[in-house]
């Protein structure tokens, strides 16, 4: 059984989708990042970087419990555990892992900054807004070009790389992106989001999504001194 510590964010949804696709049993433990639950000592034992998702597998290697953080590592682990969504063919495997790292090192961080400066920052900084809007569009362009030559992002089959990227592409309006400018990407994204397991994964903790802007207290926890306090 997987105990999953998560919240309804793109990084959480990656792992939700993978668990739904594989059918591995899991329990959800909400970690309300707006309330500061990611700084709780028990959570930090699992995720020392105070980020979610994180998980504990009670039936890890050798039948012993294992805890994990970083969503990309979790996807690789779950692929290994299930034998699914990471090809055995070495060329396909390493291509898939390359595109997974593209998400971890590029898509997630850069689109996250676009979300912040275009939507959350307390002041509008034109340089930052333009910087991350342009970077978002550059990344969408990279994906668009890739999908013109490959049915899926990692190789010719659906893999953890697709699961990692697609949740970040659900909110192009928050990133300064006109999605219709990337028709191949849009078609691929929508095809994946129509998968039953992807639908279920994106609905995990959907009732906890914030309907409006963050409160001042939440902003302090997420973006202010609470986030950067030494622990």
Which residues does each predicted region cover?
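GST-like domain detector, emphasizing the conserved glutathione-binding G-site
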Residues: 1-130, 230-231
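Short, solvent-exposed turn/loop segments enriched in Gly/Ser/Thr/Pro and often Arg
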Residues: 32, 160, 205-208
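Generic structural signal for helix capping and beta-alpha/helix-loop junctions
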Residues: 36, 189, 209-210
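GST-like fold's C-terminal all-alpha helical module
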Residues: 78, 100-196, 231
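Acidic/histidine-enriched, glycine/proline-rich intrinsically disordered or flexible terminal extensions
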Residues: 205-231
């Amino acid at each position: 059984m997987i105990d999953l510590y998560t919240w309804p964010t793109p990084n959480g949804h990656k792992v939700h989708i993978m668990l739904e696709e594989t059918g591995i049993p899991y329990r959800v433990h909400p970690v309300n990042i707006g309330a500061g639950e990611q700084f709780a000592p028990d959570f930090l034992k699992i995720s020392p970087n105070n980020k979610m998702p994180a998980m504990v597998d009670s039936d890890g290697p050798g039948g012993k419990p294992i805890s994990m953080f970083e969503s990309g590592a979790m996807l690789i682990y779950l692929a290994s555990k299930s034998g699914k969504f990471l090809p055995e063919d070495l060329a396909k495997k390493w291509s898939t892992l390359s595109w997974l790292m593209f998400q971890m090192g590029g898509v997630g961080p850069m689109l996250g900054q676009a979300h912040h400066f275009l939507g959350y920052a307390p002041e509008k900084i034109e340089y930052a807004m333009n910087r991350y809007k342009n970077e978002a569009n550059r990344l969408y362009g990279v994906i668009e070009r890739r999908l013109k030559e490959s049915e899926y992002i990692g190789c010719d089959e659906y893999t953890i790389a697709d699961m990692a990227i697609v949740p970040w592409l659900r909110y192009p309006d928050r990133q300064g992106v006109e999605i219709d400018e990337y028709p191949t990407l849009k078609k691929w994204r929508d095809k994946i989001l129509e998968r039953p397991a992807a639908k279920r994964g994106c609905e995990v903790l959907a009732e906890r999504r914030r309907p409006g802007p963050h409160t001042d207290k939440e902003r302090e926890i997420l973006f202010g001194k609470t986030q950067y306090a030494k622990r």
